[in-house]
Amino acid sequence: ESGSGKSTLLNTLAGHLTPDRGAVRFDTRADGLRDTVTMSEPERRMLSRTDWAFVHQHARDGLRMNVSAGGNVGERLMAVGARHYGDIRASATDWLGRVEINEDRIDDRPSAFSGGMQQRLQIARNLVTGPRLVFMDEPTGGLDVSVQARLLDLLRGLVREMGLSAIIVTHDLAVVRLLADRLMVMKDGHVVETGLTDQVLDDPQHGYTQLLVSSVLQV
């Protein structure tokens, strides 16, 4: 439900918000297991460019709208040290193709794209550096049903192909069923049920989860 704390939890895990107490531990490529809460701001910023990615609900929040599609992808590579223009443009072209955007749109700005294309461009921008963990906040929110289906197929394929871990916030149980191996149900800032996705959706135990499933899915 709205206001249950899903996005707050996601933003805390991703380092956008600081928790009042506790730790967020992540097995980094560079230094092994670290508490990201105690990292310095430069360390956390580099982590968000290398090991992590964040896909916003509204693509405009994750893109630079006054920069070309290729530039949006290329900037992410430059942030982790890439400098050769030809290599950067080649990687950008490759990733546009992987998210089903024609390479002849590489010099177009995102403002000329549809909502679905903007979201696919945001995904390319985030995944080009090969992150290990992707945070997604309502990645299909506000899109037409047909556009949602195409985006979900794309996301599922990329997550599997790249061996990514993903933490997804959504109120859409169809998205949960398609993308999530495990499910956590929240209400009023508390976790009320957790488990394997199929198990929770097919045999919900908590009263709120039962109500949620019965109102949305036929299981």
Tell me what each language-model feature is.
Residues 14:
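Helix-to-loop junction immediately C-terminal to a conserved catalytic motif
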Residues 176-178:
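A short, surface-exposed alpha-helical micro-motif characterized by mixed small hydrophobic
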Residues 109-113, 117:
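Conserved ABC ATPase signature
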Residues 23-46, 200:
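ABC ATPase NBD Q-loop/coupling interface
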Residues 194-195:
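ABC ATPase "signature
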Residues 87-104, 213-214:
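Conserved ABC ATPase "signature" region
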